[in-house]
């Protein structure tokens, strides 16, 4: 069973009427999902293409000058320097191969290259699967700086999972902030998840240990472990995350099965720095990029997944539970370039 199978409603828990309603909702989902994503990425799209329109205004062919301006457009859209250079070099290669390229083609060519980069980072599959063993909880350790939306992401994810009929345990292992524990408690109650907590200042690894023991004993399907996000002491952070991982592996061999880094997309280049520091501190296996609806900095999705070669699992495009969206690279590119129905 893969991670995404966890979101399928268990057959023995769904009444026929509920199943019919679920089927009706799913038939409406593709168009509605795309519309919501289009709206969520509108600021990024309008920012990118208004800059692009200005860059090619009055020009008919793609030459060195146009590519220089395109490079500036991508960098100021927070795609990142390394990824921007890669895109420009690929477009240069296409122009050299084709001998001639007009500016009217630039929109579709840029779309192709961004889609290609995302495919390289995510693989050819629509969703990347994970090897989840039957009979034991699937453990996700969630990392990220304070304020990135880590606690809210855990809460929304728990709500989605419990709504799909899964038993969810949450470990409040960010024991340095009372507010984080209290906020998680509210989300756990709202989602119908079980939360394991200790007093503020307790050993985070001890919280993780207790959470996994309880989850295993009670037949939980998924465990979500919150962690502290203090980057001012990277060595301390690395040691703490390593200790948590080692303790969890003693309870459930192979745990955590996923380490999810939550990044605030609205911070632009700061998100790159956070990704760099956390990937140095621990092995990160997936990304969640939040707050994309209120920013023109959505290019970070492209740049970070390309630079760090870590798949994006979720993006946040609003406050609602359903606006924490499983990332679909084709939907993302369609929304960014104003195309639907493909």
Identify the residue ranges that each predicted region occupies.
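P-loop/Walker A NTP-binding module and the surrounding RecA-like catalytic core of P-loop NTPases
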Residues: 82, 111-342
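Non-catalytic terminal/linker segments enriched in charged/polar, low-complexity residues
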Residues: 1-128, 133-141, 163, 168, ...
